Amino acid sequence: MAKGHRPRRGSLAYSPRKRSQSHIPRFRSWPESDAEPKLQGFAGYKVGMTHVIMIDDVKHSLTEGTEISVPVTIIETPAIRVAAIRAYGKDTYGEIAIAEAWTDVLDKDLSRRLKTAKNPDVNASLEKLETLVESGRANDIRLITYTLPSTLTGVPKKVPDVMETGVSGSDVKAKFEYAKTVLGTMVEISDVFDNGKIVDVAAITTGHGTQGPVKRWGINLMKNKHSRQGSLRQVGTLGPWTPAHVSWRVPQAGQMGYHQRTDYNKRILKMSSDVDEVNPAGGFVNYGLVRGNYILIKGSVPGPSKRLIRLREPTRSKVSSIGEPQIMHVSTQTLQG
């Protein structure tokens, strides 16, 4: 007898499944925090995956206190520069950017991404921001940062990736004072996160172009009788006669991949600059060798190698850190096949 249970194939939660507008993922919210002001996010470039041998520190686990093998993702994280301070106010429709103050210490490569002012009056811009903060019109302070991929050999581009990053804290004045101290400076990932820290990871997934409904949605193949008529990898029906239109819920061919996805509560197992501990013989496939600061994230992250990966303080975690993990060994076995 046939089963009476047949859930739909594929999730409608991410519809419409269309290409991301940019390869830079965007965080639409930042966690509220009463901690000291500092950057709430960072960015790096995906290198590849390997595995580590570590001591299981999950309480009440069956393997607690013993060595276990854990898959990890390597992300190269060169220093980022703080280019500007942005103040937000509120209007009828919500938050709106009301003022910015750009530094005059900008890298030459930034002109490849956007048009920069030749002689910005930094002091005048900061005075305007300070007036908005003192008057209470500015209710939030964020920083505009950018990466420098030209310092990496594994990422074949020179154009920086510009993004907006939140600042922790509840006092707007304290956040503004912190922003003034880091404006125009280079920030390392060690200034933002620690070993064992829980973070949210966002990236643009690997693109697969146009795919059919079987691969895109996971529907079943048609039976042999239909395949002889040329209908093997198609949906059984597009819908009823009435209403006389095709519903958006019907699985159809279209774009697959290159969507923004966010992984919540990923753990940073290690942050280091000792590249000999992770570089395999022959380098990583489609990337090469790690030559600077890097981190090891437990598990996988979205996107292919060389893809920009953004990190953020967790928004849905009950704990912000589990403690520093004890790593016994990092596999450097060649990945060349």
UniProtKB/Swiss-Prot annotation:
One Pfam family per UniProt: Ribosomal_L3
Domain of life, source organism: Archaea
Entry GO terms, CC: cytosolic large ribosomal subunit
Keywords, in A-Z order: Ribonucleoprotein, Ribosomal protein, RNA-binding, rRNA-binding
SUPFAM superfamilies in the record: Translation proteins
Span list, region Disordered: 1-32
Molecular functions per Gene Ontology: rRNA binding; structural constituent of ribosome
Biological process per Gene Ontology, one example term: translation
Family matches, as PANTHER family: 60S RIBOSOMAL PROTEIN L3-RELATED (PTHR11363), LARGE RIBOSOMAL SUBUNIT PROTEIN UL3 (PTHR11363:SF5)
Assigned protein family: Belongs to the universal ribosomal protein uL3 family.
NCBIfam families xrefs: L3_arch, PRK04231.1
Assembly with partners or alone: Part of the 50S ribosomal subunit. Forms a cluster with proteins L14 and L24e.
Function field: One of the primary rRNA binding proteins, it binds directly near the 3'-end of the 23S rRNA, where it nucleates assembly of the 50S subunit.
Entry protein name: Large ribosomal subunit protein uL3
